[in-house]
From Swiss-Prot:
<feature type="compositionally biased region" description="Polar residues">
    <location>
        <begin position="339"/>
        <end position="348"/>
    </location>
</feature>
<keyword id="KW-0153">Cholesterol metabolism</keyword>
<keyword id="KW-0753">Steroid metabolism</keyword>
<dbReference type="GO" id="GO:0045717">
    <property type="term" value="P:negative regulation of fatty acid biosynthetic process"/>
</dbReference>
<keyword id="KW-1133">Transmembrane helix</keyword>
<keyword id="KW-1207">Sterol metabolism</keyword>
<keyword id="KW-0443">Lipid metabolism</keyword>
<dbReference type="GO" id="GO:0032991">
    <property type="term" value="C:protein-containing complex"/>
</dbReference>
<feature type="modified residue" description="N6-acetyllysine">
    <location>
        <position position="269"/>
    </location>
</feature>
<dbReference type="GO" id="GO:0032933">
    <property type="term" value="P:SREBP signaling pathway"/>
</dbReference>
<dbReference type="GO" id="GO:0008203">
    <property type="term" value="P:cholesterol metabolic process"/>
</dbReference>
<dbReference type="GO" id="GO:0036503">
    <property type="term" value="P:ERAD pathway"/>
</dbReference>
<keyword id="KW-0812">Transmembrane</keyword>
<feature type="topological domain" description="Lumenal">
    <location>
        <begin position="29"/>
        <end position="348"/>
    </location>
</feature>
<feature type="glycosylation site" description="N-linked (GlcNAc...) asparagine">
    <location>
        <position position="108"/>
    </location>
</feature>
<dbReference type="GO" id="GO:0031625">
    <property type="term" value="F:ubiquitin protein ligase binding"/>
</dbReference>
<keyword id="KW-0735">Signal-anchor</keyword>
Length: 348
């Protein structure tokens, strides 16, 4: 063997080793697990992220995602209870496979488990839902419930068939319906919109009328309250005037009563003082003072009884009687029957 052949052999060996290494070394991304098949049999030990070595051409691997992933089911036919065929353009299923369940699910449903457990189940559940409802219900009335119904149905079956596979959310696009039916629905929606607008306008008008009525009621109540307040104010003014008049009358009556009491008290005191002051001796003194201050002289038979006390008058009367007895009868009485003193007084 010459040098050229030796070099070719070495190059062939190196190339074969390189090919074998390239075929045996593989990389697993983060969030994935690698399951291995050797001779078609699934090995029991999956590998995590990183570089791994396997027997080339004997062992193969499949990468299985264990983080959130979205599976899309497109153009799903669906027949309603009325016989109308509709198509749902896209259904998105957000799911996640737990790492501990990778081996069992891959063994039972292969590495393409989503086609068996999700895609087929979506078709089945959606057709059941459509066949039980009319086009009106599927397209309008119950469309918002399709997502939740599909999610619950999928998760219920997966809990039994594939524990560890969780459905996070289901999103369904609006169904495609025949063009003629779609136009009818659009016209119906337009009419419904007009009806809603008319109803809203009517509600607005009713609300405005109600607001106007409440405003009128409030205004009337305000006027009534103002009138009531003014009336109460006038009543209070009249009551105040009446009270003031009563107070003034009471004050005047009290003053008059006090004045009358004072006058009565003064008169009573004056009478009491006079009672104590006007004794017989004092009256006698005042009488003599009055006689002494009087410059007129009175003559007559009644003078002694007027200005002389009774004792003096009796003495004077007794003396005069004795003198008359000693006089002759002619001298004792004049022809006229009057005394000489009276005649002199009359003459004078």
């Amino acid at each position: 063997m010459n040098m050229t052949q030796a070099r070719l052999l070495v190059a062939a060996v190196v190339g074969l080793v390189a090919i074998l290494l390239y075929a045996s070394i593989h990389k697993i991304e983060e969030g994935h697990l690698a399951v291995y098949y050797r001779g078609g049999a699934l090995l029991t030990s999956p590998s995590g992220p990183g570089y791994h070595i396997m027997l080339p051409f004997i062992t193969t691997f499949r990468s299985v995602q264990t983080t959130l992933q979205t599976d899309e089911v497109k153009n799903v036919p669906c027949g309603t209870s009325g016989g109308v065929m509709i198509y749902i353009d896209r259904i998105e299923v957000v799911n996640m496979l737990a790492p501990y369940a990778v081996f069992d699910i891959v063994r039972n449903y292969t590495a393409d488990y989503d086609k068996t457990l999700i895609f087929n189940k979506i078709h089945h559940e959606l057709n059941q839902f459509c066949s039980a409802h009319t086009l009106q219900e599927v397209y309008i009335e119950l469309f918002d419930q399709i997502d939740e119904n599909l999610k619950q149905a999928l998760q219920k079956d997966l809990n039994t068939m594939a524990p560890g596979l969780t459905i996070q959310a289901v999103r369904v696009t609006k169904p495609k319906i025949p063009e003629a039916i779609r136009r009818n629905f659009e016209l119906m929606e337009a009419e419904k919109t007009k009806l809603l607008i008319a109803a809203q306008k009517q509600k607005v008008v009713e609300k405005e009328a109600e607001t106007e009525r409440k405003r009128a009621v409030i205004e009337a109540e305000k006027i009534a309250q103002v009138a009531k307040i003014r009336f109460q104010q006038k009543v209070m003014e009249k009551e105040t005037e009446k009270r003031i008049s009563e107070i003034e009358d009471a004050a005047f009556l009290a003053r008059e009563k006090a004045k009358a009491d004072a006058e009565y008290y003064a008169a009573h005191k004056y009478a009491t003082s006079n009672k104590h002051k006007l004794t017989p001796e004092y009256l006698e003194l005042k009488k003599y003072q009055a006689i002494a201050s009087n410059s007129k002289i009175y003559f007559g038979s009644n003078i002694p009884s007027m200005f002389v006390d009774s004792s003096c008058a009796l003495k004077y009367s007794d003396g005069r009687t004795g003198r008359e007895d000693s006089l002759p009868p002619e001298e004792a009485r004049e022809p006229s029957g009057e005394s000489p003193i009276q005649n002199k007084e009359n003459a004078g």
